[in-house]
Amino acid sequence: ILSNYNELSAFQNGGWDALSSDTQAAINRLKSVNTNWGDILFRDAFSQEYNLSLSGGTERVTYYTSFGYYKEDGNVDGVGMDRFNLVGKTSYKVNSILKVGASMFANRRKNTNYLTDAYGMSNPVFYSRKANPYFELYDKNGNYNYDYDIQNNTDKDLGFNIFEERQNTSNESVVNSFSSIFDAELRFNDKWKLTSQFGYQLEKTSREEIADWESYAM
């Protein structure tokens, strides 16, 4: 406030009485502001899961199929994960001694998060401990307010607003995986059998990090 009103030197030389009435009013207004950063930055975590399975068969053929979906909203807005998974298994009895089978597992997992800046300000746990309780995120017109005092001992003079940072940045990763297993069993009698198994696995991970020109991370 003193810097915005260009009265820092006046305060250093003459104290409170040297400030203008507008500056004193702006400072006094801070007494009515008590921002609860815990309530603003965090929320209750919530997760939901759905599964559907189908199985059956005959004396020679059996099958099992399942589909699952899981979604988790983290305790920070914009942080979460969702996952799709598919499982398929089947076996076939060729004759009295030979049985073959195949299994397939497919999974897609997407993680969303905030983009962490070099100073760690976008970390809500860290920021909630440094932010002043009298700082308001928005002005009376609904525009972002900026905190210029959050980071000391740096030449980074950009203002910071953690909600704007979330709006202008994103950190997303997607993992797609697929695996299959093929097996065969030769059963000669109750004591002797021969089994063979072959497996294949493929996994692909992609990541996208976005920080536009208005973000503190830039």
For each feature predicted by the language model, list its residue ranges.
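Residues on the lipid-exposed face of transmembrane beta-strands in outer-membrane beta-barrel proteins
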Residues: 52-58, 86-92, 180-186
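Transmembrane beta-strand segments that form the barrel wall of outer-membrane beta-barrel proteins
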Residues: 67-73
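Transmembrane beta-strand segments of Gram-negative outer membrane beta-barrel proteins
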Residues: 34-35, 60-67
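Surface-exposed loop/interface segments of Gram-negative outer-membrane beta-barrel transport/assembly proteins
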Residues: 1-34, 44, 74-79, 85, ...
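Repeated loop/turn-to-beta-strand initiation elements of outer-membrane beta-barrel proteins
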Residues: 60-63, 97-100, 192-194
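Outer-membrane beta-barrel initiation region
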Residues: 40-45, 54-58
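Outer-membrane beta-barrel channels and translocator barrels
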Residues: 47, 58-59, 95-97, 187-189
